[in-house]
Amino acid sequence: MPSLKKRNGRKEMRRTEQRNRASKNLDHMSSREIVDLMSREDQKVPLAVADELPAIARAVDGIVERMRKGGRLIYVGAGTSGRLGVLDASECPPTFGISPQLVRGVIAGGRRAVTHPVEGAEDSQTNARHDLKNLRIGKNDSLVGLAASGTTPYVLGGIAFAKRQGALTIAVTANRKSPLAKAAKIAITPDVGPEVLTGSTRLKAGTAQKMVLNMLSTATMVRLGHAYENLMIDLTKTNRKLRNRAKRILMEATGKSVSEAEQALRQSQHNLRVALIMLKRGISADTARKALEKADGDLRRALGE
């Protein structure tokens, strides 16, 4: 994909392809000089993301509204952007106890592209339409297109297809005037400036994307009730570390002892929500479970808070 576009009769280079003056002599720098420079440049990332908080919050509101109607959150990207989407999607089930079908990561080139470059995969809009057709996207879904450049054909094809299906479309790109930013209903465009290594958007642009994805998924899941206070009340307890974390969460939320937390977890069949209600209200596991069902799974309501 060409990195030049015309403006006032002249060709203008995309922001993500411009050279960073501070790193012009990068190949002459010592190790300490390189990492110092990278650290200074990285400090620009959270500031750029902060400028986009209103757009990020609007995106969360839209995603939450649709997920409450049975929709899904779907990330689409290629290369680094696609991998970041797959990573964030894969972390949601163990963190929030949700089905893997609710947050999906779609990457150009398929599973192999997560660990290996797949030549030409990002250059086809048709491939994106094919991949998304298999997901049966509808009006209650939200699709987040991830592309630092904002010009990746695969992502543009995904956005166009999702729009036709009535889904909410969100762009995350480092180029504000890019085709992707213009195509999506909500554009999140952190301007992190040129990279230390020219065009290597796995650096600042990738870091900004990761921060945005953290916010989108975490804020969405919290709004949907998958946290109590700031505790992961629905985490999946698949190993010893997570089982111990569940115990600590219960103790932290209730002020109870280790033995009391362990007993409540056993009696609730390791259901953190039920165990929390038991200890907070001093009731049996069956009564706590019924209270949770009566509150339609709303933990605060079941606790009477």
Task: Annotate the PLM regions.
Residues 2-48, 52:
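Cofactor-/ligand-binding subdomain signature composed of acidic, glycine-rich
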Residues 37-45, 105-116, 228, 269:
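Gly-rich Lys/Arg/Thr-decorated short loops/hinges at beta-loop-alpha junctions or inter-strand turns
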Residues 51-66:
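A short, well-structured juxtamembrane/interface segment
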Residues 62, 158, 216:
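Aromatic/hydrophobic pocket-lining residues that form π-stacking "cages" and hydrophobic walls in ligand
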Residues 68-69, 164:
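Residues at the C-terminal ends
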Residues 74-211, 220-224:
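Glycine-rich phosphate-binding loops that contact phosphosugars or nucleotide phosphates
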Residues 220-305:
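Short, amphipathic alpha-helical interaction segments embedded in low-complexity terminal/linker regions
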